[in-house]
Amino acid sequence: MKFLKNLVLLTLGALTLYFGTVTVLTMIYAHIDPPVTALMVWRSLEGVKVKPAVPLAYAKIPSFAKKAIVYLEDHDFWSHHGVELGAIREAWQANEKAGRVERGGSTITQQLARNLFLWPDRMYLRKALEAGTALILETLLTKDRILELYLNHIEWGPGVFGIEAGSRYQFGTGVRNLDVEQLSRLEAIITNPVKYSVKTLEHNRGMTARYYALMGW
């Protein structure tokens, strides 16, 4: 009984420390871009050479890029509060049927929470922390800031983070110089930017579908 009590207290203490740290950092990130994210650290530990992100202000990110990422990743981004219970339920049912975690059902806010603070493995513990973290992000940040941080810190190539660095890596020029076709290719590959590039996305059926969805949007 004493062991169980100590375990509960330890767990509560760890959660309090984690969410407290997330709250403080999120308040800072409301005004300052994070110099490093959890995903960057994980990639470094995997031996990937991480390149510095090149953050862009929200107003300088092409309008099509912002609208397209919401269209592809999170249709209800502007109306939900960080977590979509329906999507989580569907993902849970699919995972139970498969016998393993295959789908995440994550919103853009949850993906940002994972990239900033958590680890990339598909685990129910991480999903629970991700949901709680997303609620903090939605409480302390505006939707514009969440989308800005997301686009500036997701991976767009091996160790390449942010839409500006991703554009330079994939096309050799800044994102504001890209046309709609190039932006569609760039955003189509974010499901697996380590294995695929804008030149090889046709080798992946899902990425090809995402690309043509944007081109016909």
Per-region residue spans from a language model:
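Juxtamembrane regions of bacterial inner-membrane/periplasmic proteins
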Residues: 2-217
